[in-house]
Structure formats: C-alpha cells, structure tokens
Amino acid sequence: MSGDDTLARLAAVIESRRGGDPEASYVARLFHKGTDAILKKVGEEATEFVMAAKDGDRPKIVAEAADLWFHAMVALAHFGLTPAQVLAELERREGQSGLEEFALRKVRGREAESTKESGP
C-alpha cells in the first residue's frame, strides 16, 4: 500500500466529514468553526512539530508530523484542494534545484506585481 493511497483515503474521510455533526466529529467541528479555527490548528501543530524536532525526540517528531499533515489536509479540503494537487506540485519540482525553483518563484512574483501595477 502506497503513501499516496493512504493520503487519498484520509482525504476522502476528511471530505466525508464536511457536512457532519460538529458534536460527533472533530473534523466536522473544525469545518463548522471555519477558516480561522482550521488555520489556528495548523499553526499549533506546526509549532509542536518544530518543538519536537528541536528536542530531537524522533517518535514525537513523527507523531507531530502526522498531526501537522492531518490538519494541513483539513485546510486543503476547506479550500477545495486535494493531496493529489500537492503531490503533483512536488512531482513538478522533482529534479529541479531548490535554488533555481526559489529564483523562479521570485521572478514570477515580480511579474505578478508589475501586472497588478500596470492594471487595466
């Protein structure tokens, strides 16, 4: 069983909770509370991951990474996005130097800014 399958199954479960009862489902409760609550939880989990990594506690790093991924997937679903889209982006970047990719993003950002400034 591949990681892609695990992510796809988890994404399907998360999506199935979207209209669920907030009293019966943690994910439904997050969806019900909205964007700010979801993003706050992602931030909390990111901080916990960093703290575990700083401590070098390998089992806790894995556990916190799982929490972070899970909550990031809830955020993706909230915005109508899927893990497959993130995986496609990672595949697009595969084999590309991180420095080259960063430089290209900076160029694209400047182009987008100049387009906004010249506007209609």
Curated annotation (Swiss-Prot):
Subcellular location: Cytoplasm
Single annotated GO MF: ATP binding
Xref: InterPro entries: HisE (IPR008179), PRib-ATP_PPHydrolase-like (IPR021130)
Family stated for the protein in its record: Belongs to the PRA-PH family.
PANTHER family: HISTIDINE BIOSYNTHESIS BIFUNCTIONAL PROTEIN, HISTIDINE BIOSYNTHESIS BIFUNCTIONAL PROTEIN HISIE
Alphabetic keyword roster: Amino-acid biosynthesis, ATP-binding, Cytoplasm, Histidine biosynthesis, Hydrolase, Nucleotide-binding
Chief location of this protein within or outside the cell: cytoplasm
Pathway the protein takes part in: Amino-acid biosynthesis; L-histidine biosynthesis; L-histidine from 5-phospho-alpha-D-ribose 1-diphosphate: step 2/9
EC number(s) given by UniProt: 3.6.1.31
Species annotation: Methylibium petroleiphilum (strain ATCC BAA-1232 / LMG 22953 / PM1)
GO biological process: L-histidine biosynthetic process
Chemical reaction(s) catalysed: 1-(5-phospho-beta-D-ribosyl)-ATP + H2O = 1-(5-phospho-beta-D-ribosyl)-5'-AMP + diphosphate + H(+)
Protein name as it appears in the record: Phosphoribosyl-ATP pyrophosphatase
Pfam families: PRA-PH
Protein origin, superkingdom: Bacteria
GO cellular component, one term: cytoplasm
